Design a protein with these regions (language model features):
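Conserved Lys-Pro-Asp/Glu-containing loop-to-beta segment of HAD-superfamily phosphomonoesterases
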Residues: 317-344
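C-terminal accessory extensions appended to soluble enzyme cores
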Residues: 74, 108-150, 234, 346, ...
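Short catalytic/ligand-binding loop motif for oxyanion handling, primarily in non-cytosolic enzymes
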Residues: 1, 31, 36-43, 73, ...
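A metal-dependent, Asp-based hydrolase signature
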Residues: 191-194, 198-249
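Acidic, divalent-metal-coordinating active-site segment for phosphoryl/phosphodiester hydrolysis
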Residues: 339-355
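Substrate-recognition element of Asp-dependent hydrolases with the DxDx(T/V) motif
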Residues: 243-296, 305-309
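Active-site neighborhood of HAD-like aspartate-dependent phosphohydrolases
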Residues: 159-208
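ER/Golgi luminal nucleotide-sugar-dependent glycosyltransferases, focusing on the catalytic module
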Residues: 1-150
Length: 399
């Protein structure tokens, strides 16, 4: 709080500079840069993702939904009223907010502070980030200060860090290997294209597939696998008769699209060669044989355990899978490595378990100066075929 207040109101010169940004630079939102007391993972949605997606829809924000981003962490900021007018127009009342009970995440307030920059830019204003200790003291739109130490860490340093532990757990997707598309849902758009070519059926497969998965999860919960999902799709009047063939098509496509994150596979292999116990875990609807084949293709082998949500009926994203894992692997000798800030890091940190966050290829792109390329994979001005093609090209370049 002291850092934030000093950054925003510390001197007359500071306030003059802030008002100059409002007057001359079309500033709508001005807030402090990262402070060392805030963990790196805070610059993501964490437990607020579902609410964040809902707010993107409510406020009609057509920007890509990010995995990492800047926002006024701690809710200290200057703002132009017009820049945040859509929030004022919501007329939130005290009753809309959860009762304060020491929550550190997952409340309306936590979601609101994260949505501010996106509303500001939708309103046609700029966001500025103040970094009083940096050479560049005023940054527009983006800062990577929170990730400075992460970017210093090389492969050998990570191996040394992880080798302190006897049991190393790895997430699979976007950690050890990744799909050669920008977003996992792009696989379903590729399926739409394949269905049209093979069956001459024009369908929005992504919508159908996600609806089927939601219905399957409602019935089968964490045990949901790809057969459950396609069991739901088999009832669709347009593509139901092809459901079995489409299931095989999706499995085959996932296999073809997967490619290793070479540095991370080398980290994995180095730890395995040291005799460490290495387990792999994922929230996934594909079965063990399918995942094992993908791991083999990506040169990941000799793991000690492969734990999948659909096989054990427990998930990382609600913490239940960790309870099962720690029945067999003592947490005091344990570290987990993964890309998801919530399920691979925050949940473990809250339970006193060590974790290490690896940024996904998409997150790295979002932090770069080339994040605008993501627009080419979702802009409605492009046809679906063009967006899919752009996703494939960008996915290959990223990975």
């Amino acid at each position: 709080r002291q850092y934030s207040m000093e950054t925003l109101t510390g001197s007359p010169a500071t306030i003059d500079e802030i008002f100059k940004l409002f007057k001359e630079e079309n500033a709508g939102l001005i807030y402090p840069d990262h402070n060392d007391e805030i963990p790196l993972i805070a610059y993501s949605w964490l437990a607020n993702e579902a609410r964040g997606r809902q707010m993107f829809r409510e406020y009609d924000i057509d920007a890509p939904f990010p995995s990492v981003f800047n926002y006024p962490a701690g809710s200290f900021f200057w703002a132009r009223t017009e820049a945040l007018k859509p929030i004022f127009d919501k007329y939130y009342s005290l009753d809309d907010f959860e009762v304060e009970a020491g929550q550190t995440d997952g409340t309306l307030a936590h979601a609101l502070e994260r949505i501010l920059p996106f509303i500001c830019e939708k309103q046609g204003f700029e966001q500025f980030i103040l970094s009083p200790m940096e050479e560049q003291k005023v940054k527009q739109h983006k800062s990577t200060l929170a990730f400075k130490e992460y970017f210093k860490l090389d492969k050998q340093a990570l191996i040394m860090e992880l080798s302190q532990y006897e049991i190393i757990s790895f997430d699979i997707f976007d950690t050890l290997f990744t799909r050669s598309v920008v977003d996992p849902d792009d696989v379903f758009d590729l399926m739409s294209e394949a269905i049209y070519k093979k069956y001459n059926k024009k369908v929005d497969f992504k919508t159908l597939r996600k609806k089927a998965e939601a219905e399957a999860v409602e019935e089968n919960e964490a045990f949901t696998n790809i057969s459950h999902i396609y069991g739901k799709l088999s009832k669709d009047k347009t593509i139901g008769e092809f459901a079995t063939a489409l299931k095989d098509m999706e499995i085959d496509l996932e296999y073809k699209l997967c490619q290793p994150r070479k540095d991370m596979v080398e980290v994995y292999s180095a730890l395995k060669s040291m005799g460490k116990t290495v387990i792999l875990t994922s929230d996934m609807y594909l079965s063990k044989p399918h995942i094992a084949a993908m791991l083999h293709k990506c040169h990941v082998s000799y793991y000690d355990d492969l734990i999948l949500s659909c096989e054990v009926g427990a998930r990382k994203d609600d913490g239940s899978i960790w309870e099962l894992i720690f029945e067999h692997y003592p947490k005091e000798y344990f570290v987990h490595v993964g890309d998801n800030f919530r399920s691979d890091s925050q949940i473990l940190m809250d339970n006193g378990v060590k974790s290490f966050t690896v940024l996904s290829p998409k997150a790295l792109l979002e932090l770069s100066d080339f994040s605008y390329l993501l627009d080419y994979t979702m802009d409605s001005r492009f046809t679906r075929s063009m967006r899919v093609a752009n996703s494939l090209m960008l996915g290959h370049a990223l990975n």
